[in-house]
Amino acid sequence: MSDPAVPRRPTLDLRSFTPARVALGRSGASVPTRALLDFTLDHARARDAVHAVFDVPRLLADLGALGLAVTEARSRAADRRDYLRRPDLGRQLDAGSIEALARIASRPCQLAIVIGDGLSAAAVHAHAVALVTRLLPLLAADDAVALGHVVVASGARVALGDQIGAILGARMVVTLIGERPGLSAPDSLGAYLTFAPTPGRTDAERNCVSNIHHAGLSNDEAAFKIAWLLREGLAREVTGVALKDESADRAPRRIGTSLPE
């Protein structure tokens, strides 16, 4: 009699194409012990990612070493418990951060970058600085994009970047933020681009480059897509459903033009 805990390998083994839980086999009415233990471990890693401490000093130092003007901000979420129970507070800056950002907003800029912990500080620690490092040369190429401040924001939801971008007078804000951890990817980073950021923007007015992690979209690929969308968005003065990623087919339009060259 064959062992029911060991799945028979089909002609096309889907497990070689995806980390998803497929073809696990069975043991009686349940899955094999190994599969159950793997599930429990991945679930624990996802929970740990949500509650991980956000290492702001390390990020400020690493980004400052790249020659960037970096500052710190906080949302109105007082702690992690507050953040998880009140998503609305993660979209609003606290009073001290509003004052601090207003003091450094000397003149408008084309781009502000916000790096927020989101639902996975682990993702930000693993990928944010490396992604910014690869993005900077792409911003400096050709008609360079003028980068203003980089803001490291604690207790951040995606929409917090709208308020930050508005205070800094940025035409575009790119928010790099930890995505909700999955059972196969607890350290996935997302990048959200919003033209003319201001409080009240909807998700339909943003572009997202997601699934940035070692087993997903690489930092090089993500930086290329972000730079393309950023330049195209600035040229057309739009982001969201009206802006599609065509980076694989053509170069972005020159900023200040409305038609392809």
Swiss-Prot record:
It is found in: Bacterial microcompartment. InterPro entries: EutC, EutC_C, EutC_N. GO terms for molecular function: cobalamin binding; ethanolamine ammonia-lyase activity. GO terms for cellular component: ethanolamine ammonia-lyase complex; ethanolamine degradation polyhedral organelle. Its main location: other. Pathway: Amine and polyamine degradation; ethanolamine degradation. The keyword Lyase applies. The basic unit is a heterodimer which dimerizes to form tetramers. The heterotetramers trimerize; 6 large subunits form a core ring with 6 small subunits projecting outwards. NCBIfam families: PRK05465.1 (NF003971). This is Ethanolamine ammonia-lyase small subunit. It comes from Bradyrhizobium diazoefficiens (strain JCM 10833 / BCRC 13528 / IAM 13628 / NBRC 14792 / USDA 110). The lineage of its organism: Bacteria, Pseudomonadati, Pseudomonadota, Alphaproteobacteria, Hyphomicrobiales.
